[in-house]
């Protein structure tokens, strides 16, 4: 099980600049990913200031999401007590 679903999310978390992700979004997403990786229960994933974790409809395995800002979302799966396949998505 990999913590990140794609290279963009790995780059953002590790502080590598991406032209396709605004700097303010990258900083916020990195903080949120840190919370997801530290969580041991799904309830721990509530992001300070945003708070809501939503289960996405019709996904297998079950996928959850939380808003980073505006059109930017973090999606992830919850397996064996940890967030995996975390992905920063631009829905715009």
Predicted regions and their residues:
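A short, surface-exposed loop/turn module that caps and links secondary-structure elements
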Residues: 40-65
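Short linear functional motifs in flexible/disordered or boundary regions
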Residues: 21, 41, 48, 87-88
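Glycine-rich, flexible loop/turn motifs
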Residues: 8, 17, 49-52, 84-87
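Short basic (Lys/Arg) and small-residue
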Residues: 36
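Arg/Lys-rich, positively charged N-terminal/basic patches that mediate binding to nucleic acids
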Residues: 1-32
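Enriched for short, Lys/Arg-rich terminal
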Residues: 57, 64-92
